[in-house]
Structure formats: C-alpha cells, structure tokens
Amino acid sequence: MTKQLTLFDIPSSKPAKSEQNTQQSQQSAPVEEKKVVRREWLEEAQENKIYFLLQVDYDGKKGKAVCKLFDKETQKIYALYDNTGHKPYFLVDLEPDKVGKIPKIVRDPSFDHIETVSKIDPYTWNKFKLTKIVVRDPLAVRRLRNDVPKAYEAHIKYFNNYMYDIGLIPGMPYVVKNGKLESVYLSLDEKDVEEIKKAFADSDEMTRQMAVDWLPIFETEIPKIKRVAIDIEVYTPVKGRIPDSQKAEFPIISIALAGSDGLKKVLVLNRNDVNEGSVKLDGISVERFNTEYELLGRFFDILLEYPIVLTFNGDDFDLPYIYFRALKLGYFPEEIPIDVAGKDEAKYLAGLHIDLYKFFFNKAVRNYAFEGKYNEYNLDAVAKALLGTSKVKVDTLISFLDVEKLIEYNFRDAEITLQLTTFNNDLTMKLIVLFSRISRLGIEELTRTEISTWVKNLYYWEHRKRNWLIPLKEEILAKSSNIRTSALIKGKGYKGAVVIDPPAGIFFNITVLDFASLYPSIIRTWNLSYETVDIQQCKKPYEVKDETGEVLHIVCMDRPGITAVITGLLRDFRVKIYKKKAKNPNNSEEQKLLYDVVQRAMKVFINATYGVFGAETFPLYAPAVAESVTALGRYVITSTVKKAREEGLTVLYGDTDSLFLLNPPKNSLENIIKWVKTTFNLDLEVDKTYKFVAFSGLKKNYFGVYQDGKVDIKGMLVKKRNTPEFVKKVFNEVKELMISINSPNDVKEIKRKIVDVVKGSYEKLKNKGYNLDELAFKVMLSKPLDAYKKNTPQHVKAALQLRPFGVNVLPRDIIYYVKVRSKDGVKPVQLAKVTEIDAEKYLEALRSTFEQILRAFGVSWDEIAATMSIDSFFSYPSKGNS
C-alpha cells in the first residue's frame, strides 16, 4: 500500500543502506523450462445447489458471461457460464432492411444477426418496434454504435446488460437448474404481506406490487463470507521514493494476511542488512523465506483458501505490484491468481477483490452510511474514525525497520483493513451486499463506483424489467429542458433551495424541525420523473408552482413516474418499516442490528436520489424535474414559515429542509406538524433540540450545543481537513469554553475568555511559538503533478519542490506544506524553517475561523486587532460586525 508523505520522507544526507545486500538475497527463478496451460481458477457450479450471486463478468476468452456464485457451506466461489446463447446487442430505430444496407455493420467480423423487438415507450406506455443488432463481442457495440443515427442502450456494460435481461440481482440466492439460475427468495407469510399493505396503503398499485417484490431483498439472509485482508511492504533504497507498481523494480520484503477465520500471518523475506528486533507479536504467525520467489508462491497458496481478498488501495498498488513482481521473478501469468488487464482495477481470479479505499472514498457512503465520521481517506484516518485504532507509528524508512517491527507494522495494516469489514457485527460487508442488491450491481463494480452509477444501474434494471426503452440523454433533454428560473449560485442551471437568513447572536432553547427526506418526499408526492413532467398528452395535469405562485411546469398524474415510485418505495420502506423494526424490543438484538443496516443502506440511496437526478452528467437528468423539486421545496418551506409565524412561533433560521425555532410551545409544534401533513402530505418532525445556538449571521454557519454538551458545527472553516493543527487546537479551547455556557448570564464572561484565547494564539504566532507540524496545511494530491497545466494549487507547488530531492509524489498522497515568504508562497514541511513562516497568512487563517464565532458574541475582528495593536497586519477592510 502506498505510504503517506511525512517529515521523514526526504533523502538522508548519509548514504542509504545498501540495496545490494537485499538484491543479493534474491535467487533467480528455477531455470528448468515450464509448460503452463490456462488454469481455471474457479470450479464450476453444481446442479441443484444454492449459491449467492456476487458478481457477473464477461470472459473474453470464452466469449460468455460468467456468474460468480458463493457457497456459504464450502466458503468458496464457483463459476457458472451462460448457456442461453445471450450475446451483446444494441437497438436502433431503423427498419431491418436499412440496417442490412450499412456495410460497416453487416461486414464487421463480430456481426451476428438482426432481429425485430418490441419495446414500450416510457412516456406513453405504448408498444413500438425497434431493430436489435446482435454481435459476438461487447467491444463491437462500442465500435458499431457510431455507424447509426441513434443507438439505444449501447453504453451499458455487457455484464450489466446480461443481468438486466436475465433478471439477476447480485447478493441474492439462486439455485442452479439445467445450467441456469433460478431465484430462491424467501416466501412471504401473511404477516409480511399485511405489513406491506398497511405501509403502502396510500400508494398506487404499481408501488404496492413493487414493495412485495422488493421485500425479499431486505429480508433474505446476508451470508457470512470468509475473507482475507492483505498488505505488502516493498524495499526502497532511499526515503521518499514510492515504488512504481508497474515497474515493480524493488523486492517485496513482507506480506501480511489477516483473515476473518482468525488467520494472523506475515510472510517475511530473510535479509542480512537489518536487525531482528524485539517486538511482542501477539500471536502473529511468521514464515520466513530465503527467496522472494518462494515467498510469493506461499502467498498464492494461502490466497487461494479465501473467496474474497480485501485491500486498501490494492487496485493501484498491492495487487499490481505483486503481479508484475511475480512476472519479473519468473512466474508465468497463468500461475498468478491476479489480473491487472482492466483499467484502474485489479482482479482476484479465484474469487473477488474488494478495494476498501475506493468504497470508503465514496462520498455517499461516508456522509450517509457512516455519518461523515472521517474527513480524510487514508487507512489511518478511516481506522481512527471508525475503529478507534491506528497504524503503527515508525520514525524511519520501512526498509530499515528491524524485522519484528516490520512484521508488527505490516500486520497492523492488514488487520485494520480486515476490521473495517468486521466491526459492528460485519456492518461494512452487510452494507456492501445490501447496496449490491438495491443497485443490482456486482460487488466488485459497486465498491469501485460512485452513487450515481448505483442509482443509474437500478433504474436501467427496472426499465428493462418493464420492457421500457431506456431513452437517450439528448431525447430527455429535448423534452425536459425548459427552465423558468435563474440560478443564484454560479454554475447551477436553475434556482435552488430557499435559505432564511439567521440573525447574529446567541439564542437559547432552540428546536429544529426537519422535513423527513424533503426532496425525495417531494419527488414521491408530486409524481416527479423524467417521463411525467411537461409531457404533451395528459388527462390529469398538476401545476408546479414556486414560492411566488408562478406556474413553472406541469406534472402528469395519469401514470406513476418511475423515479417517484422507486424513491417513494425506498423512503416508505425505511421510515414505515425498517426504522421501526430496528428499534422494536420484540426483535432480537441480532435482528435489530440487521434492520439498522437495512435502513442505513436505504438512507444512502434516498438521500443521494435528488443529488444524482439533479446532476447534468446523469444520463436520466431532466432539468424540468430538477427545477420542479427545488421550486416545490421553496414553496413548502416558505408556506410552513408563514404558518409557523401565524402560530406565534419565532423562526430564527431556515435552510433547505429545516427550521430553527426559538423556545417553541409544545402545542404550537404539534399544530404545525399536523398542518404540514394535511396540506402537503409531508412528514415534519422534531429533529433536535439545542441548549443554545451561536449564529454568525451568515447562511449555513453556526455553532450549536446540545443539552448533553455535544456540539454541532456547520460551515466553520475549522472542520475542513486542511485547517492547520494550531487553529484546530485553539478552536478546541474555544469549543470547551462554549460548551460551558449554560444560561445568558454566562455569555459575557465566556466572551472575555474567548477573546483572550484568540489573542494568546496571535501572540504565539507572532513569536514563532508554533512548530512546522502545527502550522502545516494538509491537502491530498488528486492527480499526477504533470497533469496540472493551467493552474498550480499551493499543495502542488509544494510537491514540485520535493522533486530535486528524489521524492516522488503520486495521486492520493497527502502533501504537508506551510506558507512562507517566498516567490511560491509555500514550502513542503520537509524543506521549511520556522523562521520563514509568513505570519500574516496565518493571521488570515485565524481570522477566517474565529471571526465567525466572535460575530455571535457581538465582537468584530477589528476590536481584536486594535487591542493587540496589529492594525498594520490588516491592510484589507474589516468584514466583522460591531
């Protein structure tokens, strides 16, 4: 796994320990000639056995789709190749004879045949004919789709297309019958059906039937899957050099394996250039090898005992490095259970490979499944946030560690990687399986893609189930591009949410009312979908009005829209069924934990729905739908604020889907909640209650303290991960002071103490009292250094300064830099001195953070500056409030 750059990642002035000693320990691969034939890494699935479908791939050598099936009894993955004759294809709106006259198509080596198919128009529900062009190779679809005026369903990966046509749902159980998969979903009892009918009583028939069809997805057992986490350490001759996984020029000195079955093993290369060391290894089994060739052979043998391999950044580093290193040592490709032919993906041929880095990097997973608990995406940061543990700290290059320290360091990384899937009763693995079921994506693709791909795949699957034609993006835009409002935010095509400006000050006894999943609820309630808004023929039109009463669009209520149905389905399942089941005392603890996982999985999809459908890059993006959602949101919020004020409630602040009320009477709260339900059929609920909230007067910017002393910080810069540590430390002092406020009588004294803390920080900054680590900004490199052409951000400028010293930085490395008085204005911490620090730039960091809090106390930054006699540092005008 690649390592985060630290203060130690700079070449030493003394000669590095000789690489020669390590290289001399490597023996060449056996010289006898080997005859290697293609190996089938997976056994074939057996007739009449039940398996869980985990992944569908395309085997290019056999020219078939292959289903990867997990047997929970043997804990192995088996292969089932398609025997239906299914082939890649795409659709065109041309007569078959016209297609037959296109030479590039019919003379293509992969062309198979043409047939006529019947599809349903999602806008009218009428049937019509299309021509299906069938080929023998998925790559031919990509090639031939450009030879027709319009190619439908030609941008879908073949293995996903296969799942749509066969109706497969990854993560679900199937039995093999005559070489085909037949579902063995659990049967519903009368109690289940009655619960569904009750929960979806106000829904249309399509939604009720879908609810019955979907219930097994959430209720079917999630199998425990044996898995092993691996991590490799590679010898490097100088500090700061990150090994290139494609060149694989340096030896692998150790490989750690941590298994869900209790395996704790490290394979170590014997070397004569390091000491043995004396570290307590806590039951870790160590195997030593004289040659790297033998070490890798043993590693492959162990790997084959597991159906799933876990890594953290294994797509980019661990697995490619192992593969190319094995080739260098004399292994044939057929002997290596790894394939790196795919773009940005490494496959484990004897099972599945899950790169947890990519899964945890998914913003929807971070924000909704794990409630934003981590802000950085490296292994150490994620582990600290979710597990409360961290990597082993070392103060020298990995290559120079004593053997036992290397073992401890290496194994901890593998152990943490495994624990990220086992904590909270296998929470992560259960989420992955449930996400796979909901999205209809195979586990490997799901863990490597963003939420937009998940949602797109679900909708495509549902289109195919209904035999609906999946429309082209340009066709949707042609029918739904009429935008009536102007965006207030640059880059947005239409007006967004309404925000009620907050006053500056500290207010006690604040209750927050929240519209439960407002945008998804609006989509469901108003039947919003690309095929229902602004369509030409409609018997039951409904006007979409904004907060001013202007009619923006017309929604057709003749038929349920697919977006409204699926969004409403997931929302109602979560709110009406699974949130309740997760808290039901009649359920066992194990059941409650499972139901909590189910509702978390639903939350990810529900909360991501509007963001995905409101993104111009999404293939089903309809501007009129996105504009309708935000317009109705503004209408609902402004109407509710008006009603609340009529009830005598004081609305201090409102943002998108929530209202902050000052000390509201209980009966008034109940009245407004009932009114919203009656008027809009939306759920308004008490979300939280604060002891007090400090508003800066800015939108999306406040500091709230709950009755139990916990805090809720929104919009303040200190929450950003690149905020220097010294600012965070000062902020924590201020935070503790804020928490101590219990009544309005405390405010004056706490204000004085906060001002003193901020002044003290300035004095320490002025006197060079902070070290470089405390002053460092931390920013992740998102792409190779050479890819920054037009603009060069500060962290890139700092990274470029490391090049002359032999330090190679790669995408996803964290760059630590400080602001200095120089042409570039920055330096990497490895090259900087405290005396070079530009104090004025750090004063700006202090100001931007604490000016917001001070505003709530009625203190402007100018007052702070004046009392410290530092006006000369601030040539720009004050932005603070008096």
Swiss-Prot record:
Keywords: DNA replication, DNA-binding, DNA-directed DNA polymerase, Exonuclease, Hydrolase, Nuclease, Nucleotidyltransferase, Transferase. One of its GO terms (biological process) is DNA-templated DNA replication. Its EC number is 2.7.7.7. SUPFAM superfamilies: DNA/RNA polymerases, Ribonuclease H-like. It catalyses: DNA(n) + a 2'-deoxyribonucleoside 5'-triphosphate = DNA(n+1) + diphosphate. Residues 18-29 have a biased composition (Polar residues). GO terms for molecular function: DNA binding; DNA-directed DNA polymerase activity; exonuclease activity; nucleotide binding. NCBIfam families: PRK05761.1-1, PRK05761.1-3. Interacts with PCNA subunit PCNA2 and weakly with PCNA3. Belongs to the DNA polymerase type-B family. This is DNA polymerase 1. It comes from Saccharolobus solfataricus (strain ATCC 35092 / DSM 1617 / JCM 11322 / P2) (Sulfolobus solfataricus). The lineage of its organism: Archaea, Thermoproteota, Thermoprotei, Sulfolobales, Sulfolobaceae. The gene is dpo1.
